[in-house]
């Protein structure tokens, strides 16, 4: 779990919530707020099945990006959550890896709609209602991407089409699971969000890790 030291999207507060919730299901995290610690050493990164990113890190160094991209393309899982789709703006390929980039938001109580109930990343996932930021995305990368949840258009939206909300991608041997959910504790405390991350993490981890898990 790569977070950050910030009062905005305070991962230091939310990490314990998800660690406790998913720890009950034998999904365990190491936590850091340092991009260098998480991505600077390819061997260290390679010890993990999945990297979860929830932070506002503006830049990434070339060697860090190389390690992240190699980790995914060689079979690692990548789970960028919410504001992670804003990260690393100095590396254009990062948006393509995630599948899109955060553009703007408002805020409201809403429920994102599941559009593909049969995808394994949606196993046991149900739509849940909570206050969250109403993300819009840009720089979409449809290659090897499957949208699994959408946010239907709301008052004040710049367009009337459903907004892609949760999606999966594959790149090389790796799997990427992204969701725009996760602004604050109203979401991070929600059991529906816990299940969404659990299913997404297990899918992103890949079949060999799933075999060990079961």
Locate each region found by the language model:
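Short, solvent-exposed loop/turn segments at secondary-structure junctions
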Residues: 6-7, 58, 85-87, 153-155, ...
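Short, hydrophobic secondary-structure boundary micro-motifs
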Residues: 31, 105-106, 212-214
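Alpha-helix N-cap/helix-start motif
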Residues: 11, 61, 90-91, 158-160, ...
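Helical hinge/lid and interdomain linker segments adjacent to catalytic or ligand-binding clefts
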Residues: 2-88
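Catalytic beta-strand/loop cores that center a nucleophilic Ser/Cys/Thr
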Residues: 20-28, 100-175, 180
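A glycine-rich, often tryptophan-bearing local segment used as a flexible ligand/cofactor-contacting loop or short
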Residues: 58-127
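Extracellular ligand-binding/catalytic regions of CAZymes and related secreted enzymes
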Residues: 20, 24, 43, 156-162, ...
């Amino acid at each position: 779990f790569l977070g950050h030291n910030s009062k905005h999207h305070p991962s230091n507060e939310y990490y314990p919530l998800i660690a406790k919730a998913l720890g009950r299901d034998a999904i365990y995290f190491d936590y850091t707020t340092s991009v260098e610690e998480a991505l600077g050493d390819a061997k260290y990164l390679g010890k993990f099945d999945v990297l979860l990113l929830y932070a506002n890190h503006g830049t990434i160094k070339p060697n860090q990006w190389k390690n992240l991209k190699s980790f995914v393309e060689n079979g690692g899982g990548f789970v960028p959550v919410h504001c992670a789709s804003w990260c690393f703006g100095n590396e254009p390929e990062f948006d393509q890896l995630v599948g899109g980039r955060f553009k703007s938001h408002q805020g409201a109580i809403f429920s994102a709609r599941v559009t593909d109930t049969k995808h394994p990343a949606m196993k046991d996932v149900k739509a849940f209602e909570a206050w969250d930021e109403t993300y819009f995305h840009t720089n979409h990368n449809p290659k090897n991407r499957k949208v699994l949840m959408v946010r239907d258009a709301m008052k004040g939206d710049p367009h009337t089409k459903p907004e892609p909300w949760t999606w999966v991608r594959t790149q090389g041997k790796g799997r990427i699971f992204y969701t725009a959910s996760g602004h604050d504790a109203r979401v991070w405390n929600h059991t529906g969000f816990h299940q969404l991350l659990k299913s997404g993490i297990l899918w992103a981890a890949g079949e060999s890790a799933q075999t060990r898990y079961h």
